[in-house]
Design a protein with these regions (language model features):
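A compositional/biophysical signature of low hydrophobicity enriched in polar/charged and small residues
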Residues: 1-156
Length: 156
């Protein structure tokens, strides 16, 4: 397993906070030459530590005022059903996160919508994708913390 030094961690920490920095700006902030910074950043990308760089959009400015966490239970647990279900769910743009769970809930989805009527449209589409035993929706009342930054304390 590769190991990462202080400079690698600084690159990751800095890019998690602002991926729009040019290589020269990043190098200056962490105290490396531009060439060394570029090589290290490319190595982190090649190793898959940096998957991609994206723009984080404002949910509110996009008029997506409703966040819904949807718990799904199903009686189906075979591989072919899961593949069909997963492909159907992945095709719904309002589903922004999708997990297979342990415990009483088989799947958990995070859905963003304009309003309750818009969520109802998404819900109706969702239940048409596959035969589901139980669908439970919980509406977020307030976002207290939302971060895309991952902790770096576990990096070898």
């Amino acid at each position: 397993m590769p190991t990462y030094d202080r400079a690698d961690r600084l690159i990751l920490e800095t890019l998690q906070n602002d991926a729009s920095l040019s290589n020269a700006e990043l190098a200056e902030r962490i105290g490396l030459s531009a060439n060394a910074c570029w090589r290290r950043t490319r190595r982190l990308e090649e190793r898959g530590v940096i998957r991609k760089q994206v723009a984080l959009l404002s949910q509110e400015k996009l008029n997506l005022k409703v966040t819904v966490f949807v718990g799904i239970r199903t009686n189906e647990h075979n591989e072919s059903w899961l593949e069909r279900f997963a492909e159907g769910v992945k095709a719904i743009p309002e589903v922004v996160e999708f997990y297979r769970m342990s415990g009483d809930t088989d799947y958990l989805l995070k859905i963003v919508a304009e309003d309750i009527a818009d969520y109802d449209r998404v819900y109706k589409h969702l239940i048409s994708v596959a035969n589901l035993h139980d669908v439970s929706s919980s509406f977020a009342m307030e976002r207290i913390k939302s971060s895309t930054a991952l902790p770096l304390t576990h990096l070898p």
